[in-house]
Amino acid sequence: MQKETRRNSAAGSAKPNPPRKLTRAEKKQIAEIIRQAKGDGKAHTAQQTIPYIQMYPDGICKVTGRKYSKTVAFEDINYQLAQADDKTAIFENWCDFLNYFDASVSVQLSFINQGTQRGEAEKAVNIPAQEDAFNSIRTEYRDMLKNQLAKGNNGLVKAKYITFAIEADSLGAAKSRLARIETDVLNNFKLLGVSARPMTGYERLKMLHGIFHPEGGQFAFDFSWLAPSGLSTKDFIAPSSFRFGEGRYFRMGRKIGAVSFLEILAPELNDRILSDILDLETGVIVNLHIHSIDQTEAIKTIKRKITDLDKMKIEEQKKAVRSGYDMDIIPSDLATFGSEAKNLLQDLQSRNERMFLLTFLVVNMADTKRKLENDVFAAAGIAQKNNCALTRLDYQQEAGLMSSVPLGENLIPIQRGLTTSSTAIFIPFITQELFQTGAALYYGLNALSNNMILCDRKQLKNPNGLILGTPGSGKSFAAKREMTNAFLITDDDIIICDPEAEYFSLVQRLDGQVIRLSPTGKGIDGKPQYVNPMDINLNYSEDDSPLALKSDFILSLCELVIGGKEGLQPVDKTVIDRAVRNVYRPFLADPDPEKMPILGDLYNELLKQPEPEAARIAAALELYVSGSLNVFNHRTNVELSNRLVCFDIKQLGKQLKKLGMLIVQDQVWNRVTVNRAERKSTRYFMDEFHLLLKEEQTAAYSVEIWKRFRKWGGIPTAITQNVKDLLASREVENIFENSDFVLMLNQAAGDRAILAKQLNISPQQMKYVTHTEAGEGLIFYGNVVLPLVDRFPKDTELYRVMTTKPEEVGEA
């Protein structure tokens, strides 16, 4: 049997906007698409092969005279790395999901791995050149991303669908019932924590077009084109040809394919069999047709079978007596079948099990017969490993292929009866992927699927982040890679607080500004560089008075200066607050930068106050005003408008470092407030963050800033190796609660236990942060947790300016 039509697949513009008036050129283009769809006037046998009657815009498909179906697309969740309890919960919920469908609903699970959208993945990692001095770096970074993309299978777009079909007398009757089922399906997915959405008619047609055009090709279609052209939806999705005459193969366009079915022979199955088949890095389509048997009918059938087996047993016993041997000796198969039938009856009657009929189909497609046979052999090997057999559908290739498109129609009568829990073992969840487009940044490869991890922290409810890891685990490198990526593809400002002078090379290469704060006040070039902790701008707070928030900062600063267990007393705080308001009054009346107060002005104002506490606070400040640590008693003389600013505070020493970090944090807040007015994001990276959390007051201020950053367009990232110190702070829970992004690299044994409890990490996930190499770990993005690995190419200019390994820094 051979069905063939020779016409080119429709190609043209993407889905137009019907309300807009079409231009002459667009009308011409649409006319050409319709002309191509009409073909050469021969019988459209390829269209006739596709087994449905009509697709409606709302996503309902009329499959046969009385059968209607709808499709829901769903995403993956982390099943393989889940805690044992979570795995059990997912499995039980999936069993409940299957039990929801009664005998009147046919269910089809479809898993489509296709390489048709590799261009979209490459587009996501393409960094276009710009008119600046960084195109050589852009090219290098773009090439690195393309190489990483090639390592994974992001070119294989993995999609999951569930299609449910019912029989109804009319479209109206089908519509209301399908809507109820759709709502219940979405709610069931919600219970599983799975993101799902119903598909429109256009989306279902686009999906079918992708299946029938595995070599690619743009889908161009609009429902408004059907009436004037006299065409059906099939004309826009059918391939150039189908051939089914070879018995064991089919040909579709330029591709050759084969459909096989899974013979389930094993007494027990592993929950990885489906995921192993889907992990094959080849174009594969897997479909499970599941049909529930009416519970009463199933129980009656099994009881009849038990009765038949008992009759056979009695006959065997009579035969034994006549022959003169022990009547208890009966054929072993008979005893086994009887025992299994009774167990099955018990499952159905008392263990919340149902009976299902399952058809498991696997479609492989390739460019050549040899490649196809290799792909089929690989899939058959997985079946064999699980004591099953993958058997070719000889002379049923057409029915097999058409049963493998998500329409809800099963044309293959080969079915295996299974209980709910046996059916649920084909669990459709493996690992989540994180591949966003737009301004998404690269973080590494998914260690489970080898797919690229691209995500945009701005899409999170709370983009604040943490980078945690032991020395040598790749923390600083990961931060630098994120900075570079953000610098190249966004217009965000990037500010770094650098306590160890590790970022100079990268900042210099990106023409950023390094502000070196030291007790002498001398910068890298030997010229004075000062930052004024009293700096303020009129946008400093979202209310009318920016002074309240600034006063809070100065209280934190004074608390750090005074030190001691008790810190500032209520009277001290009152005195400081009064002095702050007095000092800023002239500047706020006339905001001239030359009138910006400095620490010395606060010192003098405190001396004017009558309370003895004021004199005590002033005495504590004296060291920082007129003493040897007076580096912060000057007006800011450095330009802070560069996109990339690094505050190098290594030379401040122990006495000034915490103070320096706090002052830098305040400078960043100033920048964030200015940028918000310009609708610009500010990324702030804080290395050795645990130092800020050691003092209660600086910790409280840091947490306050952490909370406030989000709605002001700030994206703070804390980097630390010292998790114990980080978690010793009472404020740290607020940091974790307000951070939807965590990059966790290798962890020490004690820290692992603490983090596992804090972030609810499973033992399987903890393996990825236990004795791992640099660049390996876990990424937490909202509710998504993925194991990642990043192997940045060492033979690049970027690697040389980003590495912090002493031997490599020397070479650079």
Regions found by a protein language model. Give the residues of each.
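Hydrophobic positions on the alpha1 helix immediately C-terminal to the Walker A/P-loop
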Residues: 478
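Conserved AAA+ ATPase "SRH/arginine-finger" region at the nucleotide-binding site
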Residues: 516-521, 741-750
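Post-Walker A helix-loop "phosphate-sensing" segment adjacent to the P-loop in P-loop NTPases
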Residues: 485-495
